[in-house]
């Protein structure tokens, strides 16, 4: 009796794993309505990119790398870049690529323009409200992914306190696979 129960439990467990895995892998109009997570990221470089960001020195391209975890693919590495206007603190043309370590799948994210408002009294900058983003495709099992959501960013102001901790981003939204 114990052997039959164990065999039945293993069979049911296997079917659940296969069903869940095949749904995500094949798409079948898979929707994750609880797409959320967070990452830490570090500044890599800044410089002019007139074609993308506009006239220098008012506009710069910024590049970052980092990693985090989310409810879609688990642990991921991330690279992203954006343009910024150094006079207004407007951040625009934000593009990110999250690569899931377990599968190698990538998800491409594009963010709406926003202002990263500095707080010199406490040496940080943050956006004032959730910034809209779009899921703009991907690779592997996430090829053709779509979706949307909102993100928040906080960052230390290194010139204010001399510290260089990673910046933080967290988000929530929906991701869909075709």
Residue ranges and their predicted role:
Residues 25-178:
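Beta-strand-enriched cores of mature, soluble protein domains
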